[in-house]
Amino acid sequence: MLSCASFNKLMYPSAADVAKPPMVGLEVEAGSIGSLSSLHALPSTTSVGSGAPSETQSEISSVDSDWSDIRAIAMKLGVQNPDDLHTERFKVDRQKLEQLIKAESSIEGMNGAEYFFHDIMNTTDTYVSWPCRLKIGAKSKKDPHVRIVGKVDQVQRAKERILSSLDSRGTRVIMKMDVSYTDHSYIIGRGGNNIKRIMDDTHTHIHFPDSNRSNPTEKSNQVSLCGSLEGVERARALVRLSTPLLISFEMPVMGPNKPQPDHETPYIKMIETKFNVQVIFSTRPKLHTSLVLVKGSEKESAQVRDATQLLINFACESIASQILVNVQMEISPQHHEIVKGKNNVNLLSIMERTQTKIIFPDLSDMNVKPLKKSQVTISGRIDDVYLARQQLLGNLPVALIFDFPDNHNDASEIMSLNTKYGVYITLRQKQRQSTLAIVVKGVEKFIDKIYEARQEILRLATPFVKPEIPDYYFMPKDKDLNLAYRTQLTALLAGYVDSPKTPSLLPPSLAGQLTPYANNNHLLLNANGLATPTGVCAPTQKYMQLHNSFQQAQNRSMVAGGQSNNGNYLQVPGAVAPPLKPPTVSPRNSCSQNTSGYQSFSSSTTSLEQSYPPYAQLPGTVSSTSSSTAGSQNRAHYSPDSTYGSEGGGVGGGGGGGARLGRRLSDGVLLGLSNSNGGGGNSGGAHLLPGSAESYRSLHYDLGGNKHSGHRAFDFDMKRALGYKAMERTPVAGELRTPTTAWMGMGLSSTSPAPAPLENGENGAAGGGASSGWRLPPGLGSPYGLSATTGLLDATPVNRRMQLAKHKDIQTLLTSLGLEHYIKIFVLNEIDLEVFTTLTEENLMELGIAAFGARKKLLTAIHTLLANEAACSTMPSSSSSQNSSSPRFSGSAAPGAERRPSNQW
């Protein structure tokens, strides 16, 4: 007999066995596999003294063990060419294999598993490697692998026979659910007793993220459950019932003769004992109030609410009806859009029906700490707050992962189940295996739809698993799960919501032909215009492709007015898609949807908040949203994209005149005028300057009716500074942004490719020739050709030069120094001009300004600012006095003369 132990001893000899002479033969009964004696010829890959492999090696059937010499296996199977052999690797059910190992066989000395696999090898003429040393009842719940080597048709026969008895696809699943990380320790229980009891009762393995213990800044809410579908569903329900319920309220300041209750108050102790809750008092000295927390279990939620109401009545007496309670929960930031719904429809509906206030953190606010970005607060009456909390839990996403051994199935058939059940299905081919990993994602209140989708994918005849979902999870609209609602759920789960905040970049005629959720960026259009699912997005490639398409479209439009690409990495065939204007791209998270409603392709979180009228264009001026300076490409990634379209903006010569003020005068920002003059087609540029309307009028002077006075060269730095200030503004959720040409030619964009050479004779003087990396703003050149006789100093009025010499903020100062790429560093660290003057070289190093030249410029600027302040405080104010605080470019210079003012940096 060749038992499992003898087989292992043969395949993995120990040092003592290697020292012995080789055995001549083995006596095997006729009923067993006689060909097993030829296994002596198979070389052993285990080194002397290593012994048999560990259980882990046996479970995974490592390629480096008994599969190293494929020639020996081919010789044993009678195959002349080893290349004709085919290898198949797949999972089998662990529990079924354990039962088979424990079973007895009809052959003495062989267990059921040994006889099963030996019989398959003998009848199919294949070689099967299986974990014969599998530990029975091990803590690990992972399914082991089996490998088969042989000819293709024989391997398929052996695989079908093995899976008919040990198939795991109908039983083993992995569920990933969202549970507040603050509740994990409560669910686990003291010494892990609570979670152990759940795992034992449901025969599942529940895993909590290990990183939460070591990472103080980032926490994961994901909990994984592994086991049979019935066990996993039961474990999910028990985990939800085991979560803590924590309700808090503020105790108002009572009269001086009214003592404040505390934990030692007999009534408080009675409530704790009667309702099985824990009452915690937390004082807040700065607010002169006390916070009362009532903590209990979800399975006893009614008792927790009753205890809270009694405490409010006891502590607040006559004003108890006015006291509102708070409940906090953790929802992962990437799930906020799913929970809130399209255009926040779920959130608004819950708040309206429950009369509560639900606060989600602003994910775009860089002042919010990472841990606070998942914290959601619900305020209102006790029962209303609890109902709102339950409905938010019902909208949390749940993912179910399982294997699908048949990789020849039509993927489109599986993907068609998305809108049928309101789920989102993804497929992934497992490495070194012929199985597919299928992920079905849905919301927790509709988890039965996930189970139905799995049942249809696997074509199972077993009864449906009925989930235990509380009635509190459902909203009134959930009763009618129609096609539109299911399609909307699929779009939310896919992560690409087609809403006014995230407009589709495809034309409507084509968007309707793709999928029910039109702007899914996980789809690519092939040459036939059909949508096919793709894998992981590659931001860099799509980013480059995006801008290349912009540049090609720009060149075509300059030469022949050709069509422009839509700029998205959804590649639309030219014959199908109508020409679209390239949208402005803001540099944000790669391949992500954020709260401001942008798809973006970089890591910066800055954006342009305000709407700015465009500059007027002169004849022969080339304008492009992708124009940039050669030097700015090495600076920080800023790309201004305005929030609103420029209404009534004068580009060219036909627009209507009139003033258009900005929406935010309270911010100290005044949007300029966009005047259009019909005669020559030259428009006065619109300027954005800080301050009041008076400063705006004094700054925008008019020199003898010069129609181009708004486009002075000295406005350039100021406009660039204002552009960088605008990019630092926090976006407002819900406001639709449309690209404009307001900042064209300012060199603010560092995300665009180098500009194409200008055509001969096309703004050649202003552009500096084809080799120049600059595209100057419209009207920057002198309209009268006086540059040879009059310098810029003489052409600029004194009051204008004084305005330019005064730096009112850090953005203007850094722009004048040519260090605008450091603006973000100073803004993030909340450094204004007052703090700037106190910085030292060590402080600049700590801020990350490593360039020596940049530090020297900044230190010189600090010294000059301090000198100017000292001079202004000591010298008497006189209109004719000249001191070190004189403005930049003050005085008059002869044509061609060089002036170096005292405060030149």
Curated annotation (Swiss-Prot):
Region (Disordered): 559-660, 751-772, 874-905
Transmembrane annotation, as ranges: none
Expression tissues: Abundantly expressed in ovaries and early embryos.
Cystine pairings recorded for this chain: none
Domain KH: residue ranges: 172-239, 324-392
Keywords of this entry: Developmental protein, Differentiation, Oogenesis, Phosphoprotein, Repeat, RNA-binding
UniProt modified residues of type Phosphotyrosine: Y644, Y696
Recorded GO MF terms: mRNA binding
SMART domains linked to this entry: KH, SAM
Gly residues bias (residue ranges): 646-660
Stretches with biased composition (Polar residues): 559-569, 630-645
SAM domain residues: 805-868
GO CC entries: cytoplasm
GO process terms (BP): actin cytoskeleton organization; follicle cell of egg chamber migration; microtubule cytoskeleton organization; mitotic cell cycle; negative regulation of oskar mRNA translation; oogenesis
Entries under Pfam families matching the protein: KH_1, KH_BICC1, KH_BICC1_1st, SAM_1
Phosphothreonine PTM sites in chain numbering: T643
Chain positions found as Phosphoserine: S557, S586, S639, S642, S646, S666, S692, S695
Record's compositionally biased regions (Low complexity): 592-611, 874-892
Function: RNA-binding protein that is involved in oogenesis. Required for correct targeting of the migrating anterior follicle cells and the establishment of anterior-posterior polarity in the oocyte. May act as translational repressor of oskar during oogenesis. Function seems to be sensitive to small changes in expression.
Similarity comment: Belongs to the BicC family.
Name used for this protein in its record: Protein bicaudal C
Organism: Drosophila melanogaster
Origin organism lineage: Eukaryota, Metazoa, Ecdysozoa, Arthropoda, Hexapoda
